[in-house]
Amino acid sequence: MARIAGINIPENKHTLIALTAIYGIGKKRSKFICSIANIPEHSKIVDLNEEQIDLLRTHVAKYVIEGDLRRERTLNIKRLIDLSCYRGLRHRRSLPVHGQRTKTNARTCKGPRKPIKK
């Protein structure tokens, strides 16, 4: 398996799809990386030579990915909670942050129903 950014990339998949195994790289960014590196999107990782894989590594390294991206996201949420702004309070209470209704929906955020005690 080819290792890019510390992640084992599946070799039997097309380059476009294989790069999406890296957290922080979706299809759009993967397509952009392939076009910059002049690598066909539909060629499989097995068919690429070492130079092309090194080229992919250098282009992927330019982005904030994997652990750094996860850390950045958690620090952003922690910052909102520490500020006690509206979005931070919603995060703290595990409620929807972007103004969605909560009377009937939002079961995923709220968690399972709590029984009413009589």
Curated annotation (Swiss-Prot):
Domain of life: Bacteria
Molecular function as annotated in GO: rRNA binding; structural constituent of ribosome; tRNA binding
InterPro entries linked: Rbsml_uS13_C, Ribosomal_uS13, Ribosomal_uS13-like_H2TH, Ribosomal_uS13_bac-type, Ribosomal_uS13_CS
Region of interest: Disordered: 94-118
GO biological process: translation
Function: Located at the top of the head of the 30S subunit, it contacts several helices of the 16S rRNA. In the 70S ribosome it contacts the 23S rRNA (bridge B1a) and protein L5 of the 50S subunit (bridge B1b), connecting the 2 subunits; these bridges are implicated in subunit movement. Contacts the tRNAs in the A and P-sites.
PANTHER family for the chain: 30S RIBOSOMAL PROTEIN S13/40S RIBOSOMAL PROTEIN S18, SMALL RIBOSOMAL SUBUNIT PROTEIN US13M
Name of the protein: Small ribosomal subunit protein uS13
Gene name of the record: rpsM
